[in-house]
Design a protein with these regions (language model features):
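A detector for short, charged/polar N-terminal pre-domain segments
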Residues: 1-11, 67
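A basic, amphipathic helix-loop patch mediating RNA/tRNA/ribosome contacts
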Residues: 9-51
Length: 71
């Protein structure tokens, strides 16, 4: 499992996918989320604006990513 480190209290799911270079565009992230291809903490998430916080686990395209905070 890879770790994605953020420097804010939370990051929106769509922004996290772009920030971690898992997708190349926001439009691609939006479509993948709406198609149900992304899970958050083991549950399908269709909300691209969902707040992802440190400790959350995002799974996409066979990979799992945990979110950590660093200031």
């Amino acid at each position: 499992m890879e770790t994605i480190t953020i420097t804010t209290e939370f990051i929106k799911l769509q922004d996290l996918l772009k920030f971690a270079n898992l997708v190349s565009t926001g439009g691609e992230a939006k479509q993948l989320i709406l198609d149900g291809q992304v899970t958050v903490n083991g549950e399908e998430c269709l909300m691209r604006g969902k707040k992802i916080r440190p400790g959350d686990v995002v799974a996409f395209d066979g990979g799992e990513y945990t979110v950590a905070y660093e200031d």
